[in-house]
């Protein structure tokens, strides 16, 4: 609705990325050792990152738009680590790990690719590209909180 009422807001999009965390990948080993774990990908919150992506070209003044690649943008990401129930406020089934550090957020800055600018095709391909644009693809990134860290490819 916001994009329809205010077309300039189309320069902002929400995106999602996921890369399996050790809580998910090492489930069997963690289960045997009695350590925090998650069985299902949908519950692997440590592996998820949520992004607010800016389509830079749409946000630039008209005279500068020709100098910026259509498909390249920036994104701000939010993720969390330590989501294993160690926090005192945790009510989850894994709350019995008080010796582990509490969860903490991570803030990232990254390049972003706009899938809508992939080569043209038929109507089905065009619809597919629109759906791909909900995903944040691996790209260089910098974690700015809680500390500074560079990722050649943030998955």
Where do the model's predicted regions map?
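Hydrophobic alpha-helical membrane segments
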Residues: 1-155
């Amino acid at each position: 609705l916001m994009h329809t009422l205010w077309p300039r807001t189309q320069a902002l999009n929400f995106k999602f990325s996921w890369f399996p965390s050790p809580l998910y990948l090492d489930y069997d080993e963690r289960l045997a050792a009695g350590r925090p774990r998650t069985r299902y990908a949908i519950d692997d919150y440590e592996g998820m990152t949520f992004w607010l992506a800016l389509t830079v070209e749409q946000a630039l003044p008209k005279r500068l738009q020709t100098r910026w690649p259509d498909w390249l943008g920036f994104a701000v990401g939010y993720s969390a680590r330590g989501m294993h129930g160690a926090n005192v406020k945790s009510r989850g089934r894994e709350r019995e790990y008080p010796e582990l550090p509490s969860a903490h957020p991570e803030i990232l800055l990254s390049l972003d690719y706009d899938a809508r600018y992939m080569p043209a095709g038929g109507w089905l391909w065009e619809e597919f590209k629109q759906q791909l644009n909900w995903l944040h693809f691996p790209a260089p990134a910098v974690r700015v909180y809680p500390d500074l860290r560079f990722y050649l490819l943030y998955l």
